Each structure stands twice: as C-alpha cells, then as structure tokens.
Amino acid sequence: MNKILDQIRTEHPLVICYTNDVVKNFTANGLLSLGASPTMSEAPQEAEDFYPVAGSVLINIGTLTKHHEHAMLENAKIANETETPLVFDPVAVGASKYRKDFCKYFLKKIKPTVIKGNASEILALIDDTATMKGTDSADNLDVVDIAEKAYKEYQTAIILTGETDVIVQDNKVVKLSNGSHFLAKITGAGCLLGAVVGAFLFRNTHPSIETLIEAVSVYNIAAERAEQLSDSKGPGTFLTQFIDALYRIDSDAVAENCNLEEVK
C-alpha cells in the first residue's frame, strides 16, 4: 500500500464535490472524517479559483437536471483545462434515455481521471441496449469483462463496484472483496466512495492502480469495521459507525485486511 491515507490526514486535500442533492451532507461528513476538506461547489464561475488548488473534482449525476447539465460540463471542462483530476460517477445512467444521452455526450467532450459505477452503470456506458432500475447493481454480469471493455473504450481508470469490486488501470485488473452488506442498505454509499477516491488523487490525473486499490480498500474495510461495531443492529446504527470508522481507520489496518486478487 502507498499509505496515501497518511498523506490525506496531514495535508487535508480539497475535494470539490458537484454531487447530488440526496447525498451532500453524508459525502461532506465522510470526507471530513477521513481527513479531507470537502467543498460542495457547483458554480462554474468559481471553478477557475477553486480547481487549481483542489486535489480533485467529483461530478456525480444522481439528481441530474437541465440546469445541472450545463454546469457539470463547464466545470468538467475547467477541470480538464487546469489538469485537475476528475472522478465521474454516472449514477443510474441506464435508468433513462435522458441520463444515458447526457453521459455519452459528457464522455465525448470530457476526459475523466476515473469512472466509478456499479456493474449496471458501467455496462450502460458501453452497451446502448443495457437498462437498469435505480442505482442497484444487476446480477449475473461478467464484471471483469465489463470493466475491461469500459477501460478500453474510454481509456481511463475504471472502478466497478459491487459485492466484488473490480479496478482496471494501465491494463492491470484487480478484484477486491472487502465491504459490508449494509452499504447496500444506506443511500449514498457509492456516491461517498467516489468522493473518497477523489481524496486520494492529489492532482494526479493518472493515478496508479495501487492508489485506487488503497482508496477503495480504505472505504470497504471501514465499512467492515462499522458493521462489527454496530453489532449488526441495522442500517441506522451502521451509518453512524461508518463515519466513525472512516475517522479511525489507519494504513496498517488497510494493508493487513485488504482482500485482493490480481486478475492480470
């Protein structure tokens, strides 16, 4: 492990979050607990001031509207122009033609550093016939194949989330198997992960696969610890313990507990 978590705790990188209305509070609190500095900025008018000093930018389309379309594209354009790392989260992209059309257009105009989504979302980016319900992952999909095809099409790092997470970068593929079933029972779990990934980028527009492994593992191992601390009482208790676990987790715990399989 690169121990970038230690760097986050000492440098408190600024993560610009243009995220959806449902998860803003949860995302900000999660980043603060981790040690990062969130700013929930959406105005392109201030992007030229914020982005050059930011560690990364997250764009999450969860509550996409016509108003957000323009602002997201403008902000993403400025991120590319200022060489600020960009995490793109195409939430529920397969749920409607509107979302899919926007994401396809966005990815033609913009170069993300990382695309993060579940299997159904990543599949929808590479298969025009794919559909989905809400933000839930589809079952019985070849997640490694989907992630590799998305990587080849968009030439950017792919983080495909699910019961087993798949990361593709620099033609390397790994599977990660940490996490908690409670993550599927709280809203915004995947959305916060996108922001956490951003916290690990530190203005690196081509992060190593090791960096991405650490980011996802910190998140998932914190979730495992939260489940243990909450004594499986339920999602509400887990949610509180998860924020605490992000605050408490350290690099040694991540290195010791990371459940990783190198696919290629």
Swiss-Prot record:
Q: Which HAMAP family match?
A: Thz_kinase (MF_00228)
InterPro entries per UniProt: Hyethyz_kinase (IPR000417), Ribokinase-like (IPR029056)
Quote the record's binding site residues for substrate: 40, 188
Q: Where do transmembrane segments lie in this chain?
A: none
Lineage, opening ranks: Bacteria, Bacillati, Bacillota, Bacilli, Bacillales
Q: Name the cystine pairs.
A: none
Its EC number(s) = 2.7.1.50
Pathway field of the UniProt record reads: Cofactor biosynthesis; thiamine diphosphate biosynthesis; 4-methyl-5-(2-phosphoethyl)-thiazole from 5-(2-hydroxyethyl)-4-methylthiazole: step 1/1
The UniProt entry, under Gene3D superfamilies, shows:
3.40.1190.20
Molecular function as annotated in GO: ATP binding; hydroxyethylthiazole kinase activity; magnesium ion binding
Q: Which residues bind ATP?
A: 116, 161
Q: Which cofactors go with this protein?
A: Mg(2+)
The entry assigns this protein to a family as follows: Belongs to the Thz kinase family.
Q: Which CDD domains match?
A: THZ_kinase
Keyword field contains Oxidoreductase? no
Instruction: Give the function comment from the record.
Output: Catalyzes the phosphorylation of the hydroxyl group of 4-methyl-5-beta-hydroxyethylthiazole (THZ).
Descriptive protein name: Hydroxyethylthiazole kinase
